Amino acid sequence: MKKPAIFFLFASLTVLLSFTAYSQTQDSTIKYKDGTYSGQSRAKYIYEPYWGSVHLTIKNGYVSDIRFVIRDSNLHETFDANYEKHFEGNAEYIQQSRNDWKGVQSYPIIYSDKQDINKVDAVSGATWSYNIFKASVNEALKNAK
């Protein structure tokens, strides 16, 4: 009696894994129109003075170049490695600023490699910049389909 149950379990698992692999393949095969596109977003942080901006180039249906920045509309400056100066004396915010700066630098590289925003994972401690990046990319790609 155990053999049919084990066989059924393995058969079910095989079907499930096949379906999962198929759906993941479908997500990564989306092709976009060649051109240059921009997207701007504040993601879910609508009460903060920050917004993200993505400029991407699509060549042969795939993203070939991508630039990402976060701007502070109150201070009129770009979020960068020096932004932590605004949090002098607050070690937690300084570390958060550093983590998010790592995200700003790495998300475009990871996205260019994966070609699927859903396959880009947030850098540890950099969810804020990840959410802004993801929303900005999605906004840019709306016009590229």
PLM feature spans:
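Bacterial N-terminal signal peptides that target proteins for export
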Residues: 1-9
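Bacterial N-terminal signal peptides
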Residues: 9-18
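Sec-dependent signal peptide cleavage junction
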Residues: 19-29
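Active-site- and interface-proximal helix/loop "cap" or "latch" segments in soluble metabolic
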Residues: 27-36, 40-53, 57-145
